[in-house]
C-alpha cells in the first residue's frame, strides 16, 4: 500500500476562509468483543475533549462504540460491557440452546438500543452528525468486506451493527437483504487502507490489545474447520484474520513514524479475551482507554497546529 502525504480528499471539510479543503481526520475502532470497552473509554475521552473526526470506522464492537460517539452519548457504551453482558439474555449457553446463538445480538442492538429500550441510541443525533460512518462486516457467502454507511442505519433498525459483531460458529449469521454476514474482522480487521483510500489525511487507530502482542491463529483455524462446510469463503477469512491484522498493524506503525497515524493501544489486556466477563478487568480497560486517549488529544492538537502553519 502506497500512501501519499496528501491523498485525494473525498468529502473533506471545507474551509471557506481559506477557500480550500482542510485535512480529513479518520478514526478506526477495531473492537475485540468485551475488550471493546477500552475503545469506549477512548471515545468517551474524545467527547469530553470535543475531539471530532470526519470519518468514523468501526469493526465488530467498535462499530457500536462509534455510533454512540457520533450521537454524542458520553458513557452510553460502558454498561453494555460491564453490566448488560452479564445478563443471560445478552450471552449465555441458554441462548445457544434456545436460539442457536451464544450472543443475542437482537437483544443488544434491538431490545436495549431501540427507542423505548433501556439504553436507546439517539438516532436523531447520530443522523445530524456531519461525520461519515463506516461499519465493516464480512459477507459470509464470498468472504468480502462490506462497508456499510450511515445511510444503512434506520430508526430501530441497527442490523448493520449486529452484522459487524456476529461471531462465526457461536452465532448464526446476521441476514440483511438476503445476504448473511459475520464479524467484520474476518474480512478487514484493521481497515486502515480503506480509510486512506476514502480521503483521510491522518488516522487515529484504536486497538484493544498491546501492539506487540503476538496472537495465535490456532483458535481461528479450529473455528474455520467447523465453518467450512456451510461458509467456505468466510472460513478462509477466519484462517487469515490474524495475518491480516498483524500486517495492517505493522503498516500502521510505519505510518505512525511519519506522523500520519496515531495508534492508541493498552499496555495489557488485563486478562480479557473476546468474551471474558470480568468486572475488574473491564473497569481497568475502560480506565486505560480514557487515560491513553491523552496521547490522541495531543496528536490531534499538534496535527491541527501543523495544518494551520501549512496554510
Where do the protein language model's features map onto the residues?
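Patatin-like phospholipase
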Residues: 5-59, 67-311
Amino acid at each position: 500500500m502506497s500512501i501519499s502525504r496528501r491523498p485525494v480528499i473525498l468529502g473533506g471539510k471545507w474551509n471557506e476562509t481559506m477557500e480550500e479543503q482542510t485535512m480529513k481526520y479518520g478514526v478506526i475502532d477495531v473492537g475485540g468483543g468485551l475488550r471493546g470497552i477500552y475503545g469506549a473509554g477512548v471515545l468517551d475521552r474524545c467527547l469530553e475533549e470535543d475531539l471530532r473526526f470526519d470519518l468514523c470506522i468501526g469493526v465488530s464492537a467498535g462499530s457500536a462504540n462509534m455510533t454512540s460517539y457520533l450521537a454524542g452519548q458520553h458513557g452510553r457504551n460502558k454498561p453494555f460491557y460491564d453490566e448488560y453482558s452479564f445478563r443471560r439474555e445478552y450471552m449465555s449457553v441458554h441462548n445457544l440452546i434456545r436460539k442457536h446463538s451464544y450472543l443475542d445480538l437482537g437483544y443488544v442492538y434491538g431490545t436495549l438500543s431501540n427507542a423505548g429500550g433501556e439504553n436507546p441510541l439517539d438516532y436523531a443525533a447520530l443522523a445530524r452528525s456531519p461525520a461519515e460512518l463506516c461499519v465493516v462486516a464480512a459477507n459470509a457467502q464470498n468472504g468480502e468486506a462490506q462497508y456499510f454507511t450511515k445511510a444503512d442505519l434506520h430508526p430501530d433498525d441497527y442490523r448493520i451493527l449486529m452484522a459487524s459483531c456476529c461471531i462465526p460458529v457461536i452465532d448464526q449469521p446476521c441476514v440483511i437483504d438476503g445476504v448473511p454476514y459475520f464479524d467484520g474482522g474476518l474480512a478487514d480487521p484493521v481497515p486502515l487502507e480503506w480509510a486512506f483510500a476514502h480521503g483521510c489525511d491522518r488516522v487515529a487507530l484504536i486497538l484493544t490489545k498491546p501492539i506487540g502482542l503476538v496472537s495465535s491463529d490456532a483458535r481461528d483455524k479450529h473455528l474455520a474447520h467447523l465453518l467450512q462446510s456451510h461458509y467456505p469463503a468466510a472460513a478462509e477469512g477466519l484462517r487469515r484474520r490474524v495475518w491480516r491484522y498483524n500486517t495492517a498493524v505493522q503498516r500502521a506503525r510505519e505510518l505512525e513514524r511519519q506522523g500520519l497515524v496515531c495508534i492508541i493501544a493498552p499496555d495489557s489486556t488485563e486478562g480479557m479475551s473476546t468474551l471474558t466477563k470480568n468486572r475488574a478487568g473491564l473497569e481497568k480497560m475502560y480506565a486505560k482507554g480514557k487515560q491513553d486517549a491523552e496521547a490522541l488529544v495531543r496528536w490531534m492538537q499538534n496535527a491541527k497546529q501543523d495544518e494551520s502553519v501549512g496554510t
